[in-house]
């Protein structure tokens, strides 16, 4: 017990989205991980649902908080003092927390680690995807492109505020004072393209998942593959079914199980009927526990994404079950797959190549083993804790060099 009290106290900062998402799960998992290892893990959170209850004046004040929030600054400083915080770990800050959290921590002499879940520092809509295609106009031509296309929440006014805030804090070199966690090396390289952040301040640390209780031997699995995700064009669901027509008509014998709902669901049903596909099953929404069990019974998880993705947890969940992943060679998702080792990759725009890739599963026992080995080495809770502590230690050491007493 005495050793646990010596662990650095951490303040986790997060602005919860109106629709719960993967970032919320990551915050909860990291809090539990820290507490399991004896850290005091305090929370400073806001919730975007607060906006719907605000009056006009409060909404104006909260919008200005994208530049600097006095409330955030005061409350975070108070929390650091009251909880004797050694390090502040930030996740999402928009729109209610804002960059003031960084200045509050730095004013208290406490280092800041920012997990980068998306591309918001480079792209106001955070996903590098617009109007049905990948878009990096803001990095190549300037942030004004986002205003033209109303990229933040579909609002020109809100996009203007987001762009002005980003430009202000770039000019103030706010972002150069932080330490960063990116979830993949692909994301790290995108972040460093900003040319404001020292490369030594950016570390790669993926998310983690708990392993399944049992693993089904690859040879004993059902003759099926599974898609788990939103039925949306940017997720590649149309490309997948177009590939499946080729696969099924060429004599392929596997079954495709599709788990999820979304705007393309009606199209999927109509397409299955029109093309008379017999080996495809639409299951609709499937809870995570059932989806993971299904992955563990299947020959592969298919991820035909058409955008860069953030960090698809389904990939790590598949690895934990020794399930290979067939994935488009694109962005963060593609960077997580080692072709022929943990899964198979195909060109993101080629239904023909995806259909051909399915045939590689006939001899994938070694790939199943490679997926499990990769999970055990990189994506367990214990591996994640070691990675996290190395990042925290580096951040606190550099902070101590600037302000020795503040890291005690």
Question: What is each of the regions a protein language model found here?
Answer:
Residues 186, 208:
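Carbohydrate-associated surface elements
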Residues 269-289:
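Nucleotide-activated donor-binding/catalytic signature segment of Leloir-type glycosyltransferases, i.e.
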